[in-house]
Amino acid sequence: MKIISVSNVKGGVGKTTTAAVLSAGLTARGYKVLMIDSDPQTNLTMCFMPEPTDGTPSLYHVYAEGKTLDEVKTSIKLNLDLVIGDFELCNADMQFLKAGRLKMLRKAFKELKSTYDFVVIDTPPNLGILSLNAFLVSDYIIVPMAADSFSLKGVRLLKQTLDEVEEETEKEVSVVGLLLTKYSDRTNVSRLLEKSVNSAAELLNTKVFESRIRQATVLQESQIAKIDLLEYAPKAPVTTDYQVFIDELLNRIEV
C-alpha cells in the first residue's frame, strides 16, 4: 500500500482537484484506492457526494473518538472508498494537539483491515496537526503549484516541516514531484513561472512533473455534477493532461 498526500500551504492551486482525479485515475487503472479528505473545507468529499448530514461517520470521528478507518469509510464505487471530511475539523489544532493526537492517523492505519493499493490524502492548505498527521503516514507527497501565481515562502515552510517530520520519525518522506496546474502556454506568466517552480523543486529535492495541467471549466463542472473528470469529460484536453500525469507518477514511483 502506497500512501500519497497532495499538499500545498497555498489554496486555489488545484490540490483537491488533483487528489480527486488521481484517485479516479488509479481506480480506472485497476487499483483499489482509499481517499481521505483531511481538509475541513470538505471539497474532496463534495467532488463525489452531496454534503453529508451531521453525525455521518467522518475523519473527525477518527481523531475525536478513535474510530477506525474501516468504521468511517464510505464506498463511492467499485474499488474507490472515501473517508469524508468534516467541518468540525476546523478546530483540530486547538482540540487535538494537547490531547496528543499527533499520530492518530498512523494508529488508524495500523488498525486498517481493508486492503488498498493506494491511499490518497487531500491535506488542508496549512501545516497544522491534520497535515502533520498526513505527512507522518505518507510515502510520497505531491505538491500542486498554480502557474498563475507563485511564492517560495510556502515551499520553504513545507521543506522545514518535512525535515522536522523526518527528524521526529526517522522516516524519509519523499516529495515525489511538483505539478504545474492552471497552465497556459499562451501566456508569458505561465512560461516565466516555470523557472521559479524549478527552483522550488530543487529546494524540495525533487523534480517538476513533465505533465502540465491546463486551466479548464470542465474541472469545476465535473465537481458540481459529482462525476469524476474521467467519466464526465474523457476526451477533454485537461483529462488527457491528468492521464499523462498519472502515468508519469506511476513510473516515478516505479509501480
Each PLM stretch: what is its role?
Residues M1-V255:
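P-loop NTP-binding core
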